[in-house]
From Swiss-Prot:
It comes from Rattus norvegicus (Rat). The modification Phosphoserine is found at residues 9, 36, 44, 49, 99, 102-103. Residues 1-13 have a biased composition (Polar residues). The modification Symmetric dimethylarginine is found at residue 26. The gene is Hmga1. This is High mobility group protein HMG-I/HMG-Y.
Length: 107
């Protein structure tokens, strides 16, 4: 009886080893580089000195943090087109708004 137990444990261990080598990770499997006959001919025709174009960088450009503040940029609105977003208050309008609020409280 002890012999049968030892025999059953050995095949299980060997199966786990095989599975472990076949299925490593849970993620997406890596794409295997396949060489088709059509692409092999094109590759041999290319010049070895030709450098492939590098991929464009993603995300924010490196120097974008060093831009000037919003005050230095001049916003030009074309006539006949509504400005987008919340309208900006000018200093004159802010003073008028304060004076109107105080007069309403008095009444």
């Amino acid at each position: 009886m002890s012999e049968s137990v030892s025999k059953s444990s050995q095949p299980l261990a060997s199966k786990q080893e095989k599975d472990g080598t076949e299925k490593r990770g849970r993620g997406r499997p890596r794409k295997q580089p396949s060489v088709s006959p059509g692409t092999a001919l094109v590759g041999s025709q290319k010049e070895p000195s030709e450098v492939p174009t590098p991929k464009r960088p993603r995300g924010r450009p490196k120097g974008s943090k060093n831009k000037g503040t919003a005050k230095t940029r001049k916003v030009t609105t074309t006539p006949g087109r509504k400005p987008r977003g919340r309208p900006k208050k000018l200093e004159k309008e802010e003073e008028e708004g304060i004076s109107q609020e105080s007069s309403e409280e008095e009444q």
